[in-house]
């Protein structure tokens, strides 16, 4: 973990950072999420898919790697009938890419910011189905694990978890932040980018702790209620 930037003893501040990220997403703004230094050691710029703008897609293309990914739940992936990109995933962190997609209508080459936005909107529409999309394309869906960051500490799961916690559609767009020379941005550059653009910055581990703190009391209350109900019916 990037402990020099986010000491574990600052748990209250960590929770506040996650809350700030959720507020930003609700307001249609972006957030930055970093993972462990021993994992991918990268920062992803993340936007809510439901409020995504052409300008935000252009920023992902300009400031990041340009590989714009749409993070979806397993249910959404099945509804869109998107098979995984490969049947035998041998990537180090088991990132669950599906086949790439394009909107079936309303796009030209599919690669422009406007076209990629059209594709994303087509994929997340309430009535979206397999016929709304062509395959392959220039947007890369990622399937999140059902348990979110508690099951897999990845940016895909962090994105979907953040959207759910913010009360938004459980789908978001991410792209890895890069430096002007094309190299991957590391923590000093990610922090500088966050400050320059006013994007809240959190770690995956902070999101894990946020979920544990927020969900554990609810789970205990439910268990107590179930126990009390069992005693009453005994």
Curated annotation (Swiss-Prot):
Keyword Manganese appears in the UniProt entry: yes
Site note Essential for catalytic activity, residues: 138, 176
One Pfam family recorded for the sequence: DHBP_synthase
Catalytic activity from the UniProt record: D-ribulose 5-phosphate = (2S)-2-hydroxy-3-oxobutyl phosphate + formate + H(+)
Biological pathway: Cofactor biosynthesis; riboflavin biosynthesis; 2-hydroxy-3-oxobutyl phosphate from D-ribulose 5-phosphate: step 1/1
Family recorded in the similarity comment: Belongs to the DHBP synthase family.
Function: Catalyzes the conversion of D-ribulose 5-phosphate to formate and 3,4-dihydroxy-2-butanone 4-phosphate.
Protein name: 3,4-dihydroxy-2-butanone 4-phosphate synthase
């Amino acid at each position: 973990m990037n402990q020099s930037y986010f000491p574990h003893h600052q748990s209250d501040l960590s929770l506040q950072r996650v809350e700030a990220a959720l507020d930003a997403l609700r307001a249609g703004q972006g957030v930055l999420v970093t993972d462990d230094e021993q994992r991918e050691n990268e920062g992803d710029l993340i936007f809510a898919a439901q409020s995504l703008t052409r300008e935000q897609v252009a920023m992902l293309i300009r400031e990041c790697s340009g590989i714009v990914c749409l993070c979806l739940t397993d249910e959404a992936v099945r509804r869109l009938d998107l098979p995984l990109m490969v049947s035998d995933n041998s990537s180090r962190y088991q990132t669950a890419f599906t086949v790439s997609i394009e909107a079936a209508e309303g796009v030209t080459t599919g690669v422009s910011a406007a076209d990629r936005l059209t594709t994303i909107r087509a994929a997340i529409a309430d009535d979206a189905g397999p016929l709304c999309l062509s395959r392959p394309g220039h947007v890369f869906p990622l399937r999140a694990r059902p348990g979110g960051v508690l099951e897999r500490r990845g940016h895909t799961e962090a994105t979907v978890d953040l959207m759910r916690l913010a009360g938004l559609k459980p789908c978001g767009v991410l792209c890895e932040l890069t430096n002007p020379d094309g190299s991957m941005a590391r923590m000093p550059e990610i922090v500088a980018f966050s400050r320059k653009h006013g994007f809240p910055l959190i770690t995956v581990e902070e999101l894990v702790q946020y979920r544990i703190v927020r969900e554990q009391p609810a789970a205990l209350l439910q268990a107590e209620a179930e126990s009390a109900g069992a005693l009453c019916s005994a």
